[in-house]
Amino acid sequence: MSTKIRYGLGLLMPFLFLLALCPTVLAEDGRAWTWLSSNDKYSKFYAPASVRVTSSVAGAGGSVATEITGEIKTGFSYEGADETIRNYKIGHVIQNPGQLSYAVAQVRVSPQKRTLQYTGETFYDAAGHVLWSKGEGTEKEMNSQQFDEEFYAAIVDMVFHRGELARLRADDRWILLWSDEMASGVKTQVTADTSTMRRVRDNLVFWAWTEVRNADGKVVEIKFDKRAVNLPQGTERIVTGKYWSSAGGWQPLEDGYEGAYRMIARGTPEERGLVRLRAFADGYSTWVTRYQIP
């Protein structure tokens, strides 16, 4: 088989999976679903007509939504269904992953907290028969490691039209704060996720990704943390996060300052990051203050 044919089939298979899924969902529940993304395990959709503002407060320019509800759908390939069944620990209910076709869920979103919470979820087979249902889930903050991040962005965009989904997909979503290489060849690089950035008074709050590579270029440490940087004072603190090493895998991030602010010293690589953050906050002030309430 030629390279071109193999490549063409590789592109065609996810598309055929999507085509096979969409008519079934539309025929069974009558909703108009909008496609968000697909990979070899999952296809994500949301129902624009289902989006409702359920709570708001008065702001300077009018009411500001503080709670939004909507419906989302996830389509499963065999591999995606198998992974989902294991994650939900429902193998005793759905024993054959081939049965699980898609799930429809009701979610509640808070734009100010950047959170999404499932209020109900139902799993179906290809004929639309219910396989399993669950009630309210845990409220989760959205970031690059969350499966539901695109759902959150699409629902918020339906109300505010501020480009949440576009920022998730932008080439410059992650910006370099600083990088530094030691004489031994060990290199550290820190990037910031602009899609998560919010300015709360003097603090710029966001999620950051730190990678440490050895002289051979192999990743030996990763930190993924939410941090608050006081821009005028030049201090920062870690709010929460996790840490990975080749020896220990992923672990909760232990911050030696126990959540307290620490000074960003002058002349350090971290100071370059502070300068970058100040420039971003000034240049994109409308973005970092979106959805704020008095």
Residue ranges of each PLM-predicted region?
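Cys/His-rich metal-coordination motifs, chiefly Zn-binding "fingers/knuckles"
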Residues: 23
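N-terminal secretory-pathway/extracellular module detecting exported/lumenal segments
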Residues: 27-105, 109-294
